[in-house]
UniProtKB/Swiss-Prot annotation:
Organism in which the protein naturally occurs: Mus musculus
Residue pairs linked by disulfide bridges in the UniProt entry: none
The organism's taxonomic lineage, starting at the top: Eukaryota, Metazoa, Chordata, Craniata, Vertebrata
Its biological purpose: Tachykinins are active peptides which excite neurons, evoke behavioral responses, are potent vasodilators and secretagogues, and contract (directly or indirectly) many smooth muscles. Is a critical central regulator of gonadal function.
Pfam entry (one): Neurokinin_B
Modified residues (Methionine amide): 91
Protein name: Tachykinin-3
Keywords: Amidation, Cleavage on pair of basic residues, Neuropeptide, Secreted, Signal
Amino acid sequence: MRSAMLFAAVLALSLAWTFGAVCEEPQGQGGRLSKDSDLYQLPPSLLRRLYDSRPVSLEGLLKVLSKASVGPKETSLPQKRDMHDFFVGLMGKRNSQPDTPTDVVEENTPSFGILK
């Protein structure tokens, strides 16, 4: 669930940046603004790759998020199976059938006397 929320936040920020939503500082700090803008220059190859990437539709985003929210419930069974296999590998194979009680012969068992 956290990963889906993080993905949605990153996607929203990247879409806002792609469509030109930019926060601008007041012009009172003009000298500092030019110094900071040099720090955030991206290489042209990265910019070209970002602009050439295909846009994400809202329907596609909703499909991905709905699959992400449904996914962990469906994958819980295989994960449980994997953990079971892991512990069986550590502890050794166990019998799949429950222990069947054997007939106890009274002659071989020690007795402590008759209780009244």
